[in-house]
Amino acid sequence: MRPRSHERHNLGGVGWLRASVLGANDGIVSTSSLILGVAAAHTSHTNILLSGTAALVAGAMSMATGEYVSVHSQADTEAAALAQERAELEVDFAGERRELTEIYVRRGLDLKLAKQVAAQLMAHEALGSHARDELGLSAESRAQPLQAALASAGSFAAGAALPLLVAALAPQPYLMISIVVVSLLSLLILGGWSAKVGGADVRRGALRVTFWGALAMAATSLVGAIAGTLG
């Protein structure tokens, strides 16, 4: 039997994976949908490419801004909680040790062992112990706004670049069908891959992402076709 210390689980990477896949999916769906809508309105190839480029830039900036603000708010909350915990340790160190002891008792340790663990951990790193076991914070899980913003913008841009590249290279008569096929295949692969890495059902994950992507493309194509007819 393999030692427990060597067991590997997928939970650690689920957060960043979800954010990356979400950004790429957004890039593919929003940009391909916009390009299809513009193309369905029978506009020029130049306008199609300009619309796709604008969608890539605007979407990436929007994702970066939203992610930065959101994660920075989380970082501010974490910093405030740590500052409060630091102040409480300075005022009532013994009380904080009792609080940590109670946490370990609730987790299943007997009182004597819980006291020993709390005393040793607080002697080594009092604030870190409370941050981890009371607040649920660790160095690995701390919010990093700039990193999150860059990752979100990068994943969106990577996804958006795919339909834009197809639009630039595909012959005009086959532009729409080429974008649909490439985008749906990409969504199918992304959905299945993220489900597999996350330990979920691959088929269900792939089909779910592909279905909603197809729905978005169909809706914007319909709007573009109607606009082209009315124009």
Predicted regions and their residues:
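The feature identifies polytopic integral membrane transport proteins across all domains of life
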Residues: 12-23, 45-53, 113, 144-150, ...
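Transmembrane alpha-helical segments and their cytosolic interface motifs
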Residues: 16-34, 139-166
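Structural signature of hydrophobic alpha-helical transmembrane segments
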Residues: 173-185
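Juxtamembrane boundary at the C-terminal end of a transmembrane helix
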Residues: 221-231
